[in-house]
Amino acid sequence: ESYYNFQQKKIAYLSLPKRYGGAKYPKVHIVDMLANQAETGKFDQVISGLLQEKIEEKLNKKEQIILIQNRRGFSPTVRCKECGSLMMCNQCKIALTFHKNKNKLICHFCSFYLNNEHLLCQECKGLELNFSGTGTQKVEQLINQTFPKSKICRLDMDTSKSSFNIASILKSFSNQEFDILIGTQMVAKGLDFPNATLVGIINADLGLYIPDFRATERVFQLIYQASGRSGRSSKEGEVVIQTYSPNSPVIENAKNLDINKFYEKELLERAELNYPPYSWLAKVEFIGPNKFKVYSLIEEVKHNLKDRYIGLDILGPAPCFLEKLKNKYRYQLVFKSKKSYDPNGSLLHAFIRKNFKIYENKKPLGQNRINIYFDPISLL
């Protein structure tokens, strides 16, 4: 949206065409993980041969490495081998994540957990469970096994319960007390480690296919920013991007560090689908403990909407991406108001105010509630 506003001459575009101190841009390598796994026959391979080779090379030079996997825990999914069911949170419609250090399956959205000892399938009571997927804890274990002499630290929400912990880990890595820093997106932005000459992005596709119009922007931003952590001094840096979608324009533009080309393509897609910056958005969430009552409410509200106008699109009703959280069901309506008809968003604001004013008194809602978001960051 900011790039579009620059094009419309509403704001100035200040850029840094060169890296500070004359540092060179890193050399970027793309690893096609499907081809890599087919070649090696290891279809559960997490660290590609190229990334392993580059890590060893940097360790031999006494240089540091940053590895990014934007998913914490050990295994994001635990599945029964007998019936195929996923181990799910009983309060949220979310798969439980296995945390090996705690030996627990934990929901990242509420306080629910299951101890791994004597764990049975929730559906068929089967004993055989398969722990699949990769989180930061698994990456840490694999790197420990492959490079046992290296000193490794990990930075994610599990190791950084306070700002003191975060500062302590980053300071130790900056002082070269550790060789390898493994983390989530927390380590991708705004950090300066002159001796870090390799950044490895374990799974660059995470988040790429989430049903949100800003998903590709977030993935591009993560890769672009993470690449900027490598080679920030006189030492040349390298970046290894592991992906299952090597031909994706997002991956290609990130590889070439071509931010303007990415912006231009993204704007074309946003214009075609009438998303910001070409429209104003409002998201209205309907939340309650009874799924059928929540859906009945949202259907009734949509049916009774008054004073619709030209340029207004209404999406839904539809389940939110996270349909059930903390024993509450979540549905949403999304309102898109074209800026060509509604230049300052006043039509959309007036429409929402008029149609939802009745619900300011919560009595008609009972146990349900309605949340209204103008210009939401995400539609998830």
Residue ranges and their predicted role:
Residues K291-L297, S340-K354:
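Short, conserved charged micro-motifs
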Residues K326-K328, P364:
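C-terminal effector/interaction modules appended to NTPase cores
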Residues F321-K324, E360-N361:
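Short proline/glycine-enriched turn/loop segments at secondary-structure junctions
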Residues I259-N260, K293-L315:
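Short amphipathic alpha-helix segments
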Residues E1-E285, N290-Y295, F321, Q332-L333, ...:
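Inter-lobe coupling/hinge segments of SF2-like helicase ATPases
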Residues K302-G311, A350-G366:
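A common structural junction motif
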Residues C153, R308-C320, P364-D375:
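Short beta-strand elements
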